[in-house]
């Protein structure tokens, strides 16, 4: 079995259904004997360019290990799911289990926001 990194972009109006999509893809992998090494929900982010007149979308990254048939099933699911705007599948040499650079950035942003909300308001 080979290792892959998959990033897919979901329509921002369908953000609530992202966990269900991830569960469906997990079930497909589990049924075929594949392994999931890392799943990261990067959340709603600004896109580099407009797709279907949208400036923001919901990003998800998955690092998996599966055979070619299972990968084709996943790719078929991405292509025929109208909520998935784009997807990218990259073959990797080894399993990635550490947080990605994007996830570290998301965690920094969340920490900064929580620090700002926890700070007492200064009277002007």
Curated annotation (Swiss-Prot):
InterPro entries on file: Ribosomal_bS6, Ribosomal_bS6_sf, Ribosomal_S6_plastid/chlpt, Transl_elong_EF1B/ribsomal_bS6
Superkingdom assignment: Bacteria
Cystine pairs: none
Protein role: Binds together with bS18 to 16S ribosomal RNA.
Residue ranges, compositional bias (Basic and acidic residues): 105-115
CDD domains: bS6
Protein name (record): Small ribosomal subunit protein bS6
Family statement drawn from the similarity comment of this UniProt entry: Belongs to the bacterial ribosomal protein bS6 family.
Gene3D superfamilies hit by this protein: 3.30.70.60
């Amino acid at each position: 079995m080979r290792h892959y990194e998959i990033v897919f972009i979901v329509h921002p109006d369908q953000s609530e259904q992202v966990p269900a999509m991830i569960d469906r893809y997990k079930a497909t992998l589990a049924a075929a004997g594949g392994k999931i090494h890392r799943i990261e929900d990067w959340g709603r982010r600004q896109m580099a360019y407009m797709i279907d007149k949208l400036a923001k979308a919901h990003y998800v990254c998955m690092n998996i290990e599966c055979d070619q048939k299972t990968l084709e099933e996943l790719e078929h699911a991405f292509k025929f799911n109208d909520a998935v705007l784009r997807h990218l599948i990259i073959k990797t040499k080894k399993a990635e289990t550490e947080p990605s650079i994007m996830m570290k950035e998301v965690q920094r942003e969340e920490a900064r926001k929580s620090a700002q909300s926890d700070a007492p308001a200064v009277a002007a």
